[in-house]
Amino acid sequence: MDATKKWTWKDTVVLFILPVELTVGALLNVLGLTKNQLLATVLVFLIFFTGFLTAVILKRDLLAEDFRKYKQHFFKNFGLSILGAIIFGGIILGGRGLFQTNQAFSQIDFTASASLSTVVPIAISGIIPLMAPFVEETVFRYELFYRWKDTKWVKIAMLIVSSVLFGLAHYNNYSSVPILMLPMMLAGAALAGLYYWRGNIWISLFAHFIYNAAFSFFPTILLIFIQLAGGK
């Protein structure tokens, strides 16, 4: 492990963000709070927003330090982030094609009528994926991989562990079928490799952010526009 960045209570808290989010999300379903779409979406947003704030606040030193370095060669680094997003997306979409799945758009209903009860949940749902990279990159790419970069065999083991856990963390996106999570695991390994190569968390974070924006946020905006334009 990097001797200059010793493990602290903050790292422990960051590791528990995702398990807490998944547990609370499951409790919402058990308690029947997901029956109301608007209420469920707002509650899920609050859960993810809390996780986002926790990760950003507790890892602000890492994020601030790496962002200063990122800005020094912004166009080069952003270009690498775009390339990373393409590779990340290519692995995921290639895997979906291989397994003949279409989770990226299967839950989008372009025929739903426009109303406050439908547009608001859709809008909120489009924002949530933009917060996810901040938590997932600090957890899977930094805490569970990059911290261990100076220990050869542990580094390799943590690359596998972090990538597998990254894929499993998205089980809800793939109908809880493990084989369908394999492309996400490989995509996570690709982001870890990008982070290791350049030594800057923002390169992988922006790559993840760009992918989520392209396949979640912008389709959501398009859906809202179509519904509102339809005047229904």
Residue ranges of model-derived segments:
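Alpha-helical transmembrane segments of multipass membrane proteins
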Residues: 20-25, 47-52, 84-92, 166, ...
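Non-cytosolic membrane-interface motifs at loop->transmembrane helix junctions
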Residues: 35-43, 107-114, 177-189
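Juxtamembrane/transmembrane-helix interface segments of polytopic membrane transporters
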Residues: 22-29, 96, 100, 216-227
